[in-house]
UniProtKB/Swiss-Prot annotation:
Motif (Q motif): 298-326
Region of interest (Disordered), residue spans: 1-34, 125-180, 696-720
Originating species: Caenorhabditis elegans
Protein name as catalogued: ATP-dependent RNA helicase glh-3
Basic and acidic residues: bias regions: 141-154, 162-172
Annotated ranges, domain Helicase C-terminal: 549-698
Length: 720
């Protein structure tokens, strides 16, 4: 037998193969032969682009099949001649396949002489099966009669490629499901082979012509199946559906759970030089309008925190209790409702997490999956997703190596994933109002055993965001325990009188109000500075403040902007993106976070900022409250907020736990004059220097409480 070399390699998948000695192979193709564990062999393809999976063998013997001469000539002529042993190979391919699974027997040839590297030269002889070829809508009747194949040419359809396959090719970048890259030279299947029943149709889906694909078509594109626009396809359409109703995008994001080592490192902030200033603040406790005296908990060792949690507290860097913690720990243990107001960075999160978790662990009142659902003992509501995620990690930190489970429930992540996590057992839920309300309504969260309800940044949810009715609805669910059987706690750095009135409706009559220092006082560890400017000069002032040359848009490599973390607050989402583009041009690593970004992007942005990979964060109101980020040295108010409470929360992102911080605000008399009287009083209370121009401008301001302007606050949908 002549064994002249050839470049042709053959891959076969069928029930039973001929012995290797009967198959003519070249030196090149012989390296592709593989054997399974039973000693049976199969051909592999030499090219690396093809899969090298071993062929599956049948338990039954294959029957020989007679090949018609027309089919043999068609294949041989397309390859461009004959080679030794070719007839034997073709005979081996066309055979009966009666394996256990009824899968068709196919062979794929890869030959440089043909137009398409993939075509089928075998068909299943099972009368029930249909010959299926990739990229075509062909049906073929194949019958077995006395060991021969009968195929009628009029039964072979050469219809155009399906849109589904074209979309799959585009999505995979031209890589077919077979694993090989399409080449420009292989633009279609041979008409000879296609007429004989072989090959894959490669007709353009767009113009219906043969020889190219829709992605390469020069003819005008077909119109969008959704809106009718010829300039794009349906999968790129941003319009509403045909019925005129805009359907919400399906959320598929599943957050990555950080490792505990990362959590301890990320949330650990060492006490600064001004930590003792917290203990100089005055403390007031009032219940039913009368002062209350209780014994404060001066250290964590004096509390009833379990030993396992106490080790985590020490590992987190807590050395002594702050004033808000000293009075909250005993009040929670006594079962009191609490309305607490303390300055930013004073440890309010630990003030409610530690006593609640301690009581639940000591009393062994925990939710397990064996209870048949999610029966949380504590629900913590927050105004933003980022704050919910932070409190969730704080809870993980304190409950590390304990049996307690704490889970986040907020919008922007996959609903099914969120439900599956809490259904495994969840003692404490931390979430935003919309998602928690949703899960309560559909029964995923059962409130029958809820003992604690905490509202963090309560003034924001009740007043600014208008979630008072939703909070009341959650409290008034029929299965939610009443006030006398449930503790309700509210915490914030600011509590306007109007919010206090609304909050009293959610608390017991004998609730205790804790005030550290003064309600609405700014953090004295933060140095507050101001720049008088107009709208057009803000950009230049910001760049100079960050050490960027405004003429060349360059930054020195040893500039502080690369080392110290800076948060820039703006009023509008578009301005955040614009400033980020400007800083990117100046080679300053900056990133944005606002309500228009998807939750996956927001989480990634915050993580990059925390790690220092992006030391400049340009943000709207979504991060102005509650976030505890290590190493924030500078806060810049590019746009002033619409009230003094938001200003206090913004500058409170720096100067945490007694560390010094710096805040710079750009003041435009055309836009910000109405907030100046409140700002002057805040500076005086914080023992800060008040600029003379600010005093002068504030003296001529009337009705300072009616200050409103367009600002990008957290929309109600954000809570979902």
């Amino acid at each position: 037998m002549d064994k002249s070399p050839t470049k042709t390699s053959i891959r076969t998948k069928f029930a039973r193969h001929q012995p290797i000695s009967d198959v003519d192979t070249t030196e090149q193709s012989s390296s592709c032969i593989k054997k399974d564990d039973r000693g049976l062999s199969s051909f592999g393809v030499q090219s690396s682009v093809f899969s090298r999976r071993s062929c599956r063998m049948s338990e039954l013997e294959a029957k020989p099949t007679i090949i018609s001469e027309d089919q043999r000539i068609a294949v041989r002529s397309e390859i461009g001649g004959s080679f030794s042993g070719f007839d034997d190979k073709v005979d081996n391919v066309f055979h009966s396949n009666n394996n256990l699974h009824g899968s068709p027997s196919t062979t794929e040839l890869e030959c440089p002489g043909i137009m398409n590297p993939r075509f089928l030269v075998g068909r299943s002889l099972n009368s029930r099966s249909r010959a299926v070829t990739r990229g075509s809508k062909r049906t073929s009747n194949v019958k077995e009669n006395e060991g021969s194949i009968h195929r009628s040419d009029d039964q072979v359809s050469t219809e155009n490629c399906s849109a589904k396959d074209e979309e799959r090719d585009r999505d995979s970048g031209g890589v077919s499901s077979y694993g090989n890259k399409r080449s420009d030279e292989f633009c279609g299947t041979s008409p000879i082979l296609e007429a004989k029943g072989f090959g894959i149709s490669n007709t353009c889906f767009n113009c219906k012509k043969y020889g190219h694909r829709a992605t390469e078509c020069s003819a005008p594109q077909r119109e969008c199946a959704n809106c009718g626009d010829p300039n794009h396809r349906a999968n790129e359409c941003a319009s509403w559906s045909k019925n005129g109703v805009q359907e919400p995008t399906k959320v598929t994001y599943v957050p990555v759970v950080d490792k505990m080592e990362e959590v301890f490192s990320m949330l650990k902030i060492n006490a600064g030089d001004f930590f003792d200033k917290f203990f100089d603040a005055s403390v007031q406790l009032v219940s039913r309008g009368q002062p209350v005296t209780i014994q404060p908990c001066k250290s964590f060792s004096d509390s009833d925190i379990p030993q396992s949690m106490r080790r985590n507290v020490e590992r987190a860097g807590y050395t002594r209790t702050t004033p808000i913690q000293q009075y909250t720990l005993p009040l929670v243990a006594d079962g009191k409702d609490i309305l607490a107001c303390a300055q930013t960075g004073s440890g309010k999160t630990a003030a409610f997490l530690l006593p609640i978790m301690s009581r639940l662990i000591l009393e062994k009142d925990l939710n397990y999956g064996a209870e048949g659902g999610c029966y949380p003992r504590c629900i913590i509501l927050t105004p933003t997703r980022e704050l919910a995620d932070q409190i969730y990690n704080e809870g993980r930190k304190f409950s590390y190596q304990s049996v307690m489970e704490i889970k986040p429930v907020y919008g922007g992540i996959n609903v099914g994933y969120n439900k599956s996590q809490i259904m495994k057992g969840c003692t404490i839920i931390v979430g935003t109002i919309g998602r928690v309300k949703h899960f309560c309504e559909d029964g995923a969260i059962k409130l029958d055993k809820c003992r604690y309800l905490v509202l963090d940044e309560a003034d924001r949810m009740i007043d600014s965001m208008g979630f008072g009715p939703e909070i009341e609805q959650i409290i008034n669910y029929k299965n939610m325990p009443k006030n006398d059987k449930r503790q309700t706690m509210m915490f914030s750095a600011t509590f306007p009188s109007s919010v206090q009135e609304a909050a009293r409706k959610l608390l017991r009559e004998d609730y205790t109000m804790i005030t550290i220092d003064k309600i609405g006082a700014a953090n004295k560890c933060v140095i507050q500075e101001f720049e008088l400017c107009d709208r057009t000069s803000k950009v230049d002032k910001l760049l100079k403040l960050l050490g960027i040359d405004i003429d060349t848009y360059t930054t020195e490599k040893n500039s502080d902007v690369f080392v110290k973390k800076t948060i820039v607050f703006v009023a509008q989402q578009k301005m955040a993106d614009t400033l980020a583009s400007i800083m990117s041009a100046a080679q300053v690593p900056a990133i944005t976070i606002h309500g228009a970004r998807e939750q996956k992007e927001r989480s990634a942005a915050l993580k990059l900022f925390r790690s220092g990979a992006k030391p400049v964060l340009i943000a709207t109101a979504v991060v102005e409250r509650g976030l505890d980020i290590k190493g924030v040295d500078h806060v810049i108010n590019y746009d002033m907020p619409n009230n003094i409470d938001d200003y206090i929360h913004r500058i409170g992102r720096t100067g945490r736990v007694g560390n010094s911080g710096r805040a710079t605000s750009f003041i435009s008399l055309a836009d910000d004059v109405q907030i100046l009287p409140q700002l002057v009083r805040t500076l005086a209370d914080a023992e800060q220097v008040v600029p003379s121009w600010m005093k002068e401008a504030a003296g001529g301001t009337s009705n300072p409480n009616k200050f409103e302007k367009s600002i990008d606050t957290e929309e109600p949908e954000e809570a979902w």
